């Protein structure tokens, strides 16, 4: 537990003790103590509505209850300087700030571990994201999903969850069939043979390249081979090539998956038949008009869904049900899917399937990612100026860099539309939020280098109690918030809270820097304490940016 959380814990304990001392309620009747941090700091560091919560039990007016609580509250035990009652009975606590200076060595000693909490208590969480068809380049929607998904995974891990990142490879549908036929056509053409591209084929230069490579490496071997053998070869070769390209792009984007799960494996391992057997055993499917239907309306879906069409083929839903059953059988406590906005209508039927399989529907959470609109020179950018096609993840990385992309994509709630200003993303100005946050880190590193020149890095005793100015206290309070921000953002699945925090910490640091002469050769004792404070800022900013997948440069 960090110092700030310890202080909050002490305040809660003293509130409970005051309730019992004032005989306002029994121990069993005391409600959960909620402490808020008021946005307006004139209302204190923390505030509680406990007096209102107790009104019914104590049978007194909240204001009167608040007065009794304050009279029985031990301020010394909870590092509290003063307590005020506001409005109908809010109790505002003003801390004496002695606890804040303890934060500096706490943060510095914790290093990369600062901000870690046990909120998740080791709960096994699987996050499935991106999962784009392996038949082409990743577009901006995939890029945003990758940034949000990976940031969420980093956040959950920081908050004590056991996280597994998974990519579902859609390798069993028509797209892969068309990919195989496209590879075959380009291979034949490279051999000088006539072969038309399939109607829904892939016409990109990369497939032409695959055809040429196959012709150079294998000659006409597969042109003469058995049709089934050659088809499997084209399919596997094309899929392997496209997956390698996806993996390379994602790794360049600092996204690595623990598991790459093949849809085809569900067919090969009998997982689809098993899932259907479970649904049949539980009387969740029925036959009608030659098709097999899932009774999804039983679980709140707007209509029942076909699982097996009258021609014997599966709908998209069938392997998806088998896949989610497989996930649950692997022992995950929570499944989080990051889906594009076009999948919103798919959520009720997927939750219905999980219920029908005998699991709690709340085991599945779906985070929706809205579309991204690029802007350049103040105008909407619909197509790549270089290729004339949709802008890809790779292209945008080359244009604006990974840091800007990771930060911009993660700085808004995923379910809100995102306008991405490419000019802003590369600008070296305070209006660019990623530059602003990174510059704060570089500024701190510069101060620390100056401190080393002054001999402040030699160790020895540090008088942290000298760190008392208004701007220093603001900075300490912001540093102390980090573990609580991590815990809350993880619980609520709101990764954009971390980019918000990084920006706020940077702003607080810049404000402190502009108001104070940070290091002063004429006051080395204060300078040493501030040197340690800067180390705490560096650690916290690094840790926040690391969650978002953004680098923390030492010089800019």
UniProtKB/Swiss-Prot annotation:
Keywords: Aminoacyl-tRNA synthetase, ATP-binding, Cytoplasm, Ligase, Nucleotide-binding, Protein biosynthesis
GO molecular function: arginine-tRNA ligase activity; ATP binding
Gene Ontology BP, a term: arginyl-tRNA aminoacylation
TM helices/strands, residue ranges: none
SUPFAM superfamilies with a match to the protein in the record: Anticodon-binding domain of a subclass of class I aminoacyl-tRNA synthetases (SSF47323), Arginyl-tRNA synthetase (ArgRS), N-terminal 'additional' domain (SSF55190), Nucleotidylyl transferase (SSF52374)
SMART domains linked to this entry: Arg_tRNA_synt_N, DALR_1
Entry superkingdom: Bacteria
InterPro entries in the record: aa-tRNA-synth_I_CS (IPR001412), Arg-tRNA-ligase (IPR001278), Arg-tRNA-synth_N (IPR005148), Arg-tRNA-synth_N_sf (IPR036695), ArgRS_core (IPR035684), DALR_anticod-bd (IPR008909), Rossmann-like_a/b/a_fold (IPR014729), tRNAsynth_Ia_anticodon-bd (IPR009080)
EC number(s) given by UniProt: 6.1.1.19
Subcellular location: Cytoplasm
UniProt cross-references to PROSITE patterns, sorted A to Z: AA_TRNA_LIGASE_I
Short sequence motif 'HIGH' region: positions: 132-142
Enzyme class: ligase
Catalytic reaction list: tRNA(Arg) + L-arginine + ATP = L-arginyl-tRNA(Arg) + AMP + diphosphate
HAMAP family with a match to the protein in the record: Arg_tRNA_synth (MF_00123)
Matching PANTHER family: ARGININE--TRNA LIGASE, CYTOPLASMIC, ARGINYL-TRNA SYNTHETASE
Quaternary structure and interacting proteins, as annotated: Monomer.
The family this protein is said to belong to: Belongs to the class-I aminoacyl-tRNA synthetase family.
NCBIfam families registered for this protein in UniProt: argS (TIGR00456)
Protein name: Arginine--tRNA ligase 1
Origin organism lineage: Bacteria, Bacillati, Bacillota, Bacilli, Bacillales
């Amino acid at each position: 537990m960090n110092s700030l959380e310890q202080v909050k814990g002490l305040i809660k304990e003293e509130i409970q003790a005051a309730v019992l001392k004032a005989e306002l309620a029994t121990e069993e009747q005391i409600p959960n103590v909620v402490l808020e941090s008021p946005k307006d700091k004139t209302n204190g560091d923390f505030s509680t509505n406990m007096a209102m919560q107790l009104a019914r039990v104590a049978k007194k007016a909240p204001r009167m209850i608040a007065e009794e609580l304050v009279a029985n509250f031990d301020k010394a035990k909870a590092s509290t300087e003063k307590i005020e009652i506001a409005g109908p009975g809010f109790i505002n606590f003003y801390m004496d700030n002695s606890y804040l200076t303890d934060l500096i060595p706490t943060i510095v000693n914790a290093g990369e571990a600062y901000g870690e909490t046990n909120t998740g208590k080791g709960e096994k969480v699987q996050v499935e994201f991106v999962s784009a068809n392996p038949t082409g380049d990743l577009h901006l929607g995939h890029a945003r999903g990758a940034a949000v998904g990976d940031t969420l995974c980093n956040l959950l891990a920081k908050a004590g969850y056991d996280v597994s990142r998974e990519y579902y490879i859609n390798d069993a549908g028509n797209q892969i069939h068309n990919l195989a036929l496209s590879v075959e056509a380009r291979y034949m053409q490279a051999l000088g043979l006539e072969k038309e591209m399939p109607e829904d084929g892939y016409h990109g230069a990369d497939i032409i390249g695959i055809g040429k490579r196959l012709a150079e490496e294998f000659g006409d071997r597969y042109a003469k081979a058995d049709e089934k053998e050659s088809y499997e070869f084209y399919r596997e070769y094309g899929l392997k090539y496209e997956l390698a390209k996806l993996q390379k792009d994602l790794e360049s984007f600092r996204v690595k998956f623990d598991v790459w799960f093949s849809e085809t494996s569900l067919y090969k391992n009998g997982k689809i038949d098993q899932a259907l057997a479970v649904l049949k055993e539980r009387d969740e499917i029925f036959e009608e008009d030659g098709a097999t239907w899932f009774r999804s309306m039983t679980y709140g879906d707007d209509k029942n869904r076909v699982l097996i069409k009258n021609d014997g083929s599966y709908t998209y839903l069938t392997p998806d049900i088998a896949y989610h059953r497989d996930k649950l059988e692997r022992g995950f406590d929570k499944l989080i899917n990051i889906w594009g906005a076009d999948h919103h209508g798919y959520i009720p039927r997927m939750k219905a399937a999980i219920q029908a399989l005998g699991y709690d529907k709340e085991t599945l959470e779906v985070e929706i990612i809205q579309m991204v609109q690029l802007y350049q020179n103040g105008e909407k950018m619909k197509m790549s100026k270089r290729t004339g096609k949709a802008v890809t993840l790779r292209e945008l990385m080359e244009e604006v860099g990974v840091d800007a992309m990771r930060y911009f994509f993660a700085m808004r709630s995923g379910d809100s539309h995102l306008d991405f200003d490419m000019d802003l993303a590369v600008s070296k100005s305070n209006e660019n939020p990623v530059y602003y946050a990174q510059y704060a880190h570089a500024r701190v590193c510069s101060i620390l280098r100056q401190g080393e020149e002054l001999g402040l890095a030699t160790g020895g005793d540090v008088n942290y109690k000298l760190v008392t100015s208004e701007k220093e206290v603001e900075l300490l309070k912001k540093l102390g918030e980090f573990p609580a921000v991590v815990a809350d953002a993880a619980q609520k699945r709101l990764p954009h809270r971390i980019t918000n925090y990084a920006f706020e910490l940077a702003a607080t640091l810049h404000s402190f820097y502009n108001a104070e002469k940070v290091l002063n050769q004429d006051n080395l004792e204060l300078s040493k304490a501030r040197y340690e404070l800067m180390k705490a800022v560096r650690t916290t900013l690094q840790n926040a940016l690391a969650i978002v997948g953004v680098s923390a440069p030492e010089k800019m």
